[in-house]
Amino acid sequence: GAGGAVAAAELADAGLDVVVLEQGHHWTSADFTQREDEMMPRLFEEGGMRQTEDGSIIVMQGRCVGGSTVHNLCYAFRTPDPILRMWRDEHGLGELTTEAMAAPFERVERNLKVKQIRDDEVNAMNQAIRRGTEALGWSGFVTKHNREACVQSGYCILGCSYDAKQSMLVTYVPRAERAGARVLSNARADRIDVSDGRVRGVVGRVVDHAGIPGACIDVRAKVVVLAAGAIASPDLLLRSRIANRSGQVGR
């Protein structure tokens, strides 16, 4: 996904030996049929029906090379200043200032071909929302997006059949591979291996499209980058029994 692919590309570009494990399959635009019954099981955990314990919220969690960027709606805006301020004030991340983040944001925006959505691309529903926010005196804006030569087919959530969506699948993952990174799809990470207080690698299994496990995987590494999203990342930390001194992982 967005975190792992960017890290893999940057590290591979720097000359490091990089292995990427992705539980999902490596689908491409040729596989995107624009049919919900075919694409939902391919691109999402539990066919897009994963939900909270009480059933009140459905979680659209990606499961494919490219992660959630394959099925998201391509809205690309920078981390808002109030959020950066909260991270600095409440979490001690003093280096994350608006000024310090400007150059990294610009670099990513260039790589993803981020551009302003034009007024003629704003549909009637969103035009009505804009009029409503203005009438109420609320703040609102037309965001930017990372599409190139979009044909406006309307099937963003099922993967872009035209490679117009500048997802990790067509940007950072190919870049990482060109720099020598090895991307292993259908490879589920089950546990981060720790010995003598240091991370030594990742242990997992090969899985098929239905999630049925096969052969074992054992990757030895000096550094492990965990980039499995808001749900799978804490789950893997808990299963590995690491990085939870605070007791807040997964809460």
Mark where each language-model region is.
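Glycine-rich NAD(P) Rossmann-fold beta1-alpha1 loop
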Residues: 1
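Redox-cofactor-proximal catalytic regions of oxidoreductases
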Residues: 37-117
